[in-house]
């Protein structure tokens, strides 16, 4: 999972 992108959501 792309946690780096999810945190930017």
Swiss-Prot record:
Keyword line: Neuropeptide, Secreted
A GO BP entry: neuropeptide signaling pathway
Entry's Gene Ontology cellular component terms: extracellular region
Keyword Secreted belongs to the record: yes
Compartment list: Secreted
Protein role: FMRFamides and FMRFamide-like peptides are neuropeptides.
Entry's family note: Belongs to the FARP (FMRF amide related peptide) family.
Protein name, per record: Extended FMRFamide-2
Organism this protein belongs to: Tyrannophasma gladiator (Gladiator)
Organismal lineage: Eukaryota, Metazoa, Ecdysozoa, Arthropoda, Hexapoda
């Amino acid at each position: 999972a792309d946690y780096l992108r999810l945190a930017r959501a």
